[in-house]
Curated annotation (Swiss-Prot):
<keyword id="KW-1133">Transmembrane helix</keyword>
<dbReference type="InterPro" id="IPR003372">
    <property type="entry name" value="PSII_PsbL"/>
</dbReference>
<keyword id="KW-0812">Transmembrane</keyword>
<comment type="function">
    <text>One of the components of the core complex of photosystem II (PSII). PSII is a light-driven water:plastoquinone oxidoreductase that uses light energy to abstract electrons from H(2)O, generating O(2) and a proton gradient subsequently used for ATP formation. It consists of a core antenna complex that captures photons, and an electron transfer chain that converts photonic excitation into a charge separation. This subunit is found at the monomer-monomer interface and is required for correct PSII assembly and/or dimerization.</text>
</comment>
<dbReference type="GO" id="GO:0009539">
    <property type="term" value="C:photosystem II reaction center"/>
</dbReference>
<keyword id="KW-0472">Membrane</keyword>
<keyword id="KW-0150">Chloroplast</keyword>
<keyword id="KW-0934">Plastid</keyword>
<dbReference type="GO" id="GO:0009535">
    <property type="term" value="C:chloroplast thylakoid membrane"/>
</dbReference>
<keyword id="KW-0604">Photosystem II</keyword>
<dbReference type="Pfam" id="PF02419">
    <property type="entry name" value="PsbL"/>
</dbReference>
<dbReference type="InterPro" id="IPR037266">
    <property type="entry name" value="PSII_PsbL_sf"/>
</dbReference>
<protein>
    <recommendedName>
        <fullName>Photosystem II reaction center protein L</fullName>
    </recommendedName>
</protein>
<keyword id="KW-0674">Reaction center</keyword>
<keyword id="KW-0793">Thylakoid</keyword>
<feature type="transmembrane region" description="Helical">
    <location>
        <begin position="17"/>
        <end position="37"/>
    </location>
</feature>
<dbReference type="GO" id="GO:0015979">
    <property type="term" value="P:photosynthesis"/>
</dbReference>
Length: 38
């Protein structure tokens, strides 16, 4: 852990978790739509 810029570290972590959340929502939407249309 570097104490020079901890704010940038948390911003990177938030961005990564945001991308994972969007990916999860996208996958769930695809599965749900395929379940509905079949």
């Amino acid at each position: 852990m570097s104490k020079s810029n901890p704010n940038k570290q948390s911003v990177e972590l938030n961005r990564t978790s945001l991308y994972w959340g969007l990916l999860l929502i996208f996958v769930l939407a695809v599965l749900f739509s395929s379940y509905i249309f079949n």
